[in-house]
């Protein structure tokens, strides 16, 4: 049996009671830490909380070499843990398909997700979001323009864009860095992004939301990670008022 369990947004206490009970009864516990991370805890603290050893998985362990995980699931009760909500990442969906191909039963226990959390924090309505995109750290002279293409297409359709910011080992892209990279893309295409919404540490007691122009937010202090960006489309009056009251939009 392979059960996918979402751990929520920030620390060990975000997991549901159902999820925690399943973890504590599992024979094998795996945690992937490459799509997102719980910044309010660490693996030592999680092991003490779960009363179980936890095997940390790298991207290659899931995408290229999942046999050890699937072998465990074939012979015992196995849980696959991730920050946020399972199946938001396509790699989780692929793993579930691979398990099914081997005849391994699967289940999902959901957790709170950044996808819904940003709507509550920013006041932007969830049905007015289009396709999301990711901004990676540049590699040498390589810097993709595809994130801007997604943003422009969404704005053409009056939709908001959720922009995931890159994570590499212990390096976390900030709102400031993400804006600088998007502004460089926009300058090359000679287009303008009117304003951004930056969100930091969603799910924590120190969560922060700020809205403003690139010039304003590039120098703003968003504090520790994780960060995420929103590029709004056309705003409803209530969305604008919410951003003004809770995110400093002028």
Swiss-Prot record:
UniProt keyword terms in alphabetical order: Methyltransferase, S-adenosyl-L-methionine, Transferase
UniProt-listed Enzyme Commission number(s): 2.1.1.98
Gene Ontology molecular-function annotations: diphthine synthase activity
Residues engaged in binding S-adenosyl-L-methionine: 9, 85, 88, 113-114, 165, 202, 227
Enzyme class: transferase
GO biological process entries: methylation; protein histidyl modification to diphthamide
Pathway: Protein modification; peptidyl-diphthamide biosynthesis
Catalytic activity: 2-[(3S)-amino-3-carboxypropyl]-L-histidyl-[translation elongation factor 2] + 3 S-adenosyl-L-methionine = diphthine-[translation elongation factor 2] + 3 S-adenosyl-L-homocysteine + 3 H(+)
Protein family membership: Belongs to the diphthine synthase family.
HAMAP family: Diphthine_synth
Assembly information from the UniProt record: Homodimer.
Function: S-adenosyl-L-methionine-dependent methyltransferase that catalyzes the trimethylation of the amino group of the modified target histidine residue in translation elongation factor 2 (EF-2), to form an intermediate called diphthine. The three successive methylation reactions represent the second step of diphthamide biosynthesis.
Protein name: Diphthine synthase
Gene name as annotated: dphB
